[in-house]
């Protein structure tokens, strides 16, 4: 049976992109696409972005916050890597620049405000450090090369391996300019996954030789919610897509089948965060369900000026749902 309707669990970039392509390439009606999400900021993960912002944001006196400031991470755009994203943004209009697509808006702004950082590293008493000298020794280079050139079918060797464990024979790398710049650019720690480091090395390999200036980084005109997410939201709303907010999907119902690899969703259970109630949504045979099985912010926590962010070892909402 040909599917005619779609349910999107979460309103993150991946699901919104899927909706755009269903409409433009699949000739679907927007009214047949429904998003169930906490808010229009992301996936089926933790508390809403607005809750955190309101708690930390003193709108009347921004510099008088007593808790701290939230600087959420963004996508570090690189045209040579983000080909699919730029294709997506070329399909939707900018919300601030009349007559431009969202991609043209970004290219126009970026061409006039090129990235060229003059001070990636600072050292007390010395000022700017020459980041051009990466500081890698031969063993660092060998281990990095092995990581980058590892075939995909061997990546499972890195299951549950931290970056510190991978480089245990050469901890020197963590005292190099390369590591200081790479970890702060891509939010890595030595406890992070070696698999994730390998994938980032593949994705952002162009930045390896220019990381001291980040000249390959392309920037949006405004923050990425306003320059990427908002154009998507406005376009999809204009196409008639349904956004059901304040919902966190907590469980799937599956059709009984003798086929191990045949997965058919027949229902969804979700929390109405606003009302504190549980809701059920039936899924018929004409509907396909899209779910992003993880989120980089899934188990994120926040600290403040006086308290470090607590460590959360529990599975986040998206990961817990995927495990079911």
Protein language model annotation of sequence segments:
Residues 245-274:
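A conserved short coil-to-beta-strand element within the FAD-binding core of flavoproteins
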Residues 14, 41, 296:
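Conserved Rossmann-like nucleotide-cofactor binding loop
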Residues 271-324:
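Glycine-rich loop(s) and the adjacent beta-strand/alpha-helix scaffold that form part
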Residues 76-84, 211-237, 243-246:
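Short beta-strand to alpha-helix junction loop
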Residues 23-61:
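Glycine-rich FAD pyrophosphate-binding loop
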Residues 95-206:
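Rossmann-like flavin
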Residues 57-105:
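Conserved FAD-binding subdomain of flavin-dependent enzymes
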Residues 2-34:
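N-terminal Rossmann-like FAD-binding beta1-loop-alpha1 element of flavoenzymes
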